[in-house]
Curated annotation (Swiss-Prot):
Residues 194-229 form the UVR domain. This is UvrABC system protein C. Belongs to the UvrC family. Disulfide bonds: none annotated. One of its GO terms (biological process) is SOS response. Signal peptide: none annotated. GO terms for molecular function: DNA binding; excinuclease ABC activity. Interacts with UvrB in an incision complex. Its main location: cytoplasm. It comes from Deinococcus geothermalis (strain DSM 11300 / CIP 105573 / AG-3a). One of its GO terms (cellular component) is excinuclease repair complex. Keywords: Cytoplasm, DNA damage, DNA excision, DNA repair, Excision nuclease, SOS response.
Length: 616
């Protein structure tokens, strides 16, 4: 597998799965999926082997690293991938153990005994488990030494004096307070961070009201540490040991992604997903779910007693009855509204959205851009808009009025064909006149012979800018599809009385027609936003460059003892006042035509400007 064949990965925590022929050969977890997977392709050794053998990569996003650890462990146990050889046997996995004592302590162990202790795991990443233990040891005052009760009472240790232990070994611990700490640690390790955070915040506020600011500060640090590592809730499992499937759906135009997670014994052990095409034309979430259920569950070898859905669909009762008869027991389809099960569905929804975005980006990268087909359909274009040109203006109170033109082909920027225009003959802000002039120069000047006509023109602006561009098209006798994109609500401005089809109507009087508002995830809108953002940045950066050059020239005109040749030489070597002011005297003196005396004069002049409050 090559790096260029990877799906577009999010920069978020999760689990990634290298597969060969559909079989997992390596499963790993990451705090940042994008960075971690990229590292495998740069490394040699074992990473080089499984990246070379893999023919696909899959990923599951999680809320935090702890959840990723748990999910990774369950998937490795389920699939036993070849290149996770060191982690295959459960007896080698590290567990976190809360001992069964009057004052429990937290330890890392690789043996699970029937000793009444509470075990959490297994975890395949020993270093990450130690980090979790270190955080709990630092922030929760559990005892750190073993062997209670002691024959001889020791002196209080450093942890006690630092507030990191309640001191049971010196009989200083309140059993009730210690029990509360133990309950907090259990809740965190079971994935119930939210109530712990809420209680810690309440205790912190109470300490502050009592003016015990040292204790309030400790509690504040504890809250921040818990929120950073655990988030507000864990979602990789539920507390009860149950079997169920939970589904998530994401849609973008005619494309949809359904992801199904299998939860067995209260823990996620696997996932299936489908990338669906043809969901356009009014298909709602229920219809997409119905199509997936029909495809998946008619082939499934095991159906759990409960299937959680993000939305209801019309045939759910029929499918529930069919699957119940097939399984020989009741199979329920439910749409949870609150609680643990609703949060499982929310996890599936997030992963479906991330998976859909990844699939769409991969299609775009391979040239099979779904947004171009969506644009053709939405705008009733005669052809797929392979080449799109975007236009925007930039100025500050009418000075240095410029326009930018960017070119996209196949959904990707073609920066070698981007162009910048200095708007001529305008000394006051007039966005409409600037747009008219820019379109006219593009269609009738030298660029008309150098560049092919686009399949679509996008104007960054509202009705006024679109009308000005249409006038320029009409004057140049060019009929190219044109739309605007207004920043407010990302509204698409359509030309012509006959909606978006004016370019198909010969003899139609051109004017601004209606507006179109698409969902933000719609592939067509994604394309237009990408072009708009590129041209806006391009025009603004050009305007800033001209503004800086103008300011630099005006300052150079005032430099004492610096003639025209030296000014031109300095302008060639220094692109901004900041660059010139920061340069040492020796660098300025090295500019052709300059000498040490002239350079010192320049530095002195700029220093005086700064001292007088004039910005450089």
């Amino acid at each position: 597998m090559h790096f260029d064949d990877l799906p577009v990965l999010p920069a978020s925590p999760g689990v990634y799965i290298f597969r060969r022929g559909g079989t997992p050969i390596y499963i790993g977890k990451a705090v940042n999926l994008r960075s971690r997977v990229a590292q495998h392709f740069k490394a040699g050794g074992k990473s080089g082997k499984f990246t070379a053998l893999a023919d696909s990569l899959d990923f599951i996003t999680t809320r935090n690293e702890v959840e990723a650890l748990i999910l990774e462990a369950n998937l490795i146990k389920q699939h036993r991938p070849h290149y996770n050889v060191l982690l295959k046997d459960d007896k080698h996995y590290p567990f976190l153990k809360l001992t069964n004592e009057a004052f429990p302590m937290l330890v890392v162990t690789r043996r699970v005994l029937k000793d009444g202790a509470s075990y959490y795991g297994p975890y395949p990443d020993a270093s990450a488990v130690r980090r979790v233990k270190h955080l709990i040891d630092t922030m929760f005052p559990l005892r750190k030494n073993s062997g209670l009760p002691m024959q001889k009472k020791p002196r209080p240790c450093l942890n006690y004096h630092m507030g990191r232990c309640l001191g049971p070994c010196v009989d200083a611990a309140d059993p009730q307070a210690y029990a509360q700490v133990v309950e907090d640690v259990k809740a965190l390790l079971e994935g119930r961070a939210a109530p712990v955070i809420a209680r810690l915040k309440a205790d912190m506020q109470a300490a502050a009201r009592a003016q015990d600011f040292e204790q309030a500060a400790r509690l504040r640090d504890r809250v921040q540490a818990v929120e950073k590592l655990f988030g507000t809730e864990q979602h990789a499992y539920v507390s009860e040991e149950t079997d169920l499937d939970f589904l998530g759906v994401a849609q973008a135009g005619e494309y949809a992604m359904v992801q199904l997670f299998r939860l067995r014994g209260g823990r996620v052990v696997g996932r299936d997903k489908r990338f669906l095409v043809g969901a356009e034309g009014g298909a709602d979430v229920g219809e997409v779910l119905g199509a997936f259920v029909q495809d998946y569950y008619t082939q499934a070898t095991h159906v759990p007693p409960l299937i959680l859905l993000p939305a209801e669909f019309e045939d759910a009762p029929v499918w529930s009855a069919f699957l119940s008869e097939r399984a020989g027991r009741r199979v329920e389809m439910r749409t949870p509204k609150r609680g643990d099960k609703a949060e499982l569905v929310e996890m599936a929804q997030r992963n479906a959205a991330a998976g859909l975005e990844s699939e769409l980006a991969l299609l775009e990268r391979r040239g099979d851009h779904p947004g171009l087909d969506a644009l053709r359909e939405v705008l009733a274009l005669p052809d797929r808009p392979w080449r799109i040109e975007g236009y925007d203006n930039s100025n500050l109170f009418g000075s240095n009025i410029v326009s930018g033109m960017v070119v996209f082909e196949g959904g990707r920027a073609r920066r070698s064909e981007h162009r910048r225009f200095k708007v001529r003959g305008l000394d006051h802000p007039d966005d409409y006149a600037a747009m008219h002039q820019t379109i006219t120069r593009r269609l009738t000047g030298s660029l008309a012979d150098k560049l092919p006509l686009p399949d679509l023109i996008l104007i960054d602006g509202g009705r006024g800018q679109v009308h000005a561009a249409l006038d320029a098209l009409r004057a140049a006798d060019v009929r190219v599809p044109l739309v605007g994109l207004a920043k407010r609500e990302e509204r698409i401005i359509l030309p012509g009385r006959f909606g978006a089809q004016w370019w198909l109507e010969t003899g139609t009087e051109v004017g601004v027609g209606g507006e179109l508002l698409l969902p933000h995830t719609h592939p067509a809108l994604r394309v237009l936003i990408g072009v708009r953002d590129e041209v806006h940045h391009y025009a603004v950066s050009y305007h800033r460059t001209l503004r800086g050059e103008q300011m630099l020239r005006s300052v150079f005109d005032d430099l004492p003892g610096i003639g025209q040749k030296r000014r031109d030489a300095l302008l060639e070597h220094f692109t901004s006042l900041e660059d010139l002011a920061a340069a040492p005297v020796e660098r300025i003196a090295a500019v052709p035509g300059m000498n040490l005396r002239a350079a010192q004069s320049v530095k002195k002049f700029l220093a005086e400007r700064t001292a007088n409050g004039t910005p450089t």
